[in-house]
Every structure is written in C-alpha cells, then in structure tokens.
Amino acid sequence: MKKEKLGALVFWASLLVLAVCAFLLAGRPTLIPTGIPGDAVAFGMGAEEVTQTAGPPDGTRSENGVRTGFFLYYYQREVLGCPATVSYTFHGRQESPRARVAEVAVDMEFATQAECDQMLEALCAHFRELMEGEPRFDEYGSEGPVRAWDPPELLQSRSITSARRSVFISQFPCRIFLEVRGNG
C-alpha cells in the first residue's frame, strides 16, 4: 500500500514539475534576430536589453494615445558601411518590463542615386539570402507609388516576408527607408 502511494506521489510531483517548466518556457519571449547587418538587437528584447546591447539611445519618444508604445533612436549607426539612423519600436509602455522590440526602422541617405540603387540591391540580396530558407518565404517588388497612401516621390518598394520577419524597403530619390517587423 505504501509503495502505491509513493509511486502516485512521485508521478504527481513529476507532472507538477513538468507543468511548471512548461509555464516558465512559455512565458519567456523568443528572441528572433532583426536581420539588419551589424545589428545585435533581436525581436523580443526589452528596453534594458536593447540599451545593454546597442548602447544608450540618442533619443526616445513615447506614444500613449490609441497605440501605446515607445521608440529608441540611434542616429550614428552603420548599415553595410553606410551611415544610418536606426529606431526600435516597442509595444507597451516604457516603464513596463513586458514591453518588447516589435519593429526596427532604418533611414539612410546617399549623395547619388547610383549609391542608393547599389544599397537597395545589397539590402535585398542580404535579406533574400537570410530568409529564403524560412517557412512562408515570399518576395514582391513594385515600381513607383502603387497604393493611394504611397508618397508620390516613391521610386520603388520591395517586400520580403517569411514566418519569422517581414522586411519592407522603400526607395526614394537618394534615400532608402527599411522596416523590419517580427512575426513571432
């Protein structure tokens, strides 16, 4: 009789330990690299982790209206050897420990359109190589403004998506704007 009770107790204790481990793993965010060349920040990081990884931001901004979030700005970064401004968008309030990186935006300006064209192709090649093995990979490109809300100066846009991240690259005269969103 004691053997049966001890066996049942061990069974229920191991089941409880398994449930606690599953709960702890489910509550931890999955970190997915942004994919931006030279960027060590990952989707799912909190603000403190980002500042430890990328250093103190050059600027911050909070949005506490219909959408709640905040932004960390880094003005003196490099992407593929070119100067860039990088901003990280967090969902949630800045004081919340649960606020996580949800989007990264990169803004780059060039002296000539040829440099801009080369960077566009380099970024597309980088993200294509990075993402084409991921589930639900897709790539789409368009020339000029297509949607009603596209700015008239838009030269072309490229979208590269997968199950892990979505990349949107917009090319303007001598300027590229890149957005990467985590899909996790």
Segments predicted by a language model, with ranges:
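Short beta-strand micro-motifs in enzyme catalytic cores
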Residues: 67-73, 145-147, 176
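Short, ordered beta-strand-loop transition motifs
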Residues: 61-68, 94-97, 137-143, 168-172
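An acidic-aromatic pocket/loop used at catalytic or ligand-binding sites
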Residues: 109-111, 148, 152-184
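N-terminal leader/targeting segments
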Residues: 31-93
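N-terminal Sec-pathway targeting helices
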Residues: 1-17
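Long, charged/polar, surface-exposed segments that mediate recognition or autoinhibition
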Residues: 81-146
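Membrane-interface motif at the C-terminal end of an N-terminal transmembrane signal
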Residues: 19-33
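Generic beta-strand hydrophobic packing signal
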Residues: 60, 102-104, 163
